[in-house]
Amino acid sequence: MRRTRVKVCGITSAADAGLAITAGADAIGMVFYTKSPRHISISTAREISSAMPPFVSTVGLFVNSSQQEVSMVLADVSLGLLQFHGDEDESFCSSFNRPYIKAVRVKPETNLMQLCSQYPSASGILLDSYKKGIPGGTGEIFDWNMIPGDLPLPIVLAGGLDASNVAAAVSIVQPWAVDVSSGVEISPGKKDKQKIEQFIQAVEGTRQ
């Protein structure tokens, strides 16, 4: 079975970035959305991104930010990938000359095929749980059986994942990557070493 990549999102400190990287994360995510409890300052994000080892991706998460706001972050922070969680259209997402993934909050009536067709330039599509008024980080799972098996974009699966359910999620969805935030935390924005290690071990166990 192909190896499923792991992204640890909502990193707010260099120490937590180090925990994720040491445990084997393929990517870390930093949230540039001021209403999130996991919001990170540009100065801290710069410190983290400048200390990243080779072959670990840094991902910047934005929610309905302006062109200027995203550009300001990019001027100071080395990001390999952008992640858009709001109502951004393809023209906006693709305007920064960076690979990007588009997040979708999945509801029963969501037409994922149609949504993928609206973002042909995306590197992948992130599927998250829907909760009214919350653009991500809900800590809740959704019905993975709603995901078509033939989506044209690589799937990044999010939404309520933790060490106890991620193996089942990988088995059912077979995503390119899984994205975890609250499932490896002590409190919002504060990661737990043991939970990160257990999560990554659970993902790696699906290859056996």
For the regions a language model picked out, list residue spans one by one.
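Conserved N-terminal beta1-alpha1 strand-loop-helix module at the mouth
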Residues: 1-208
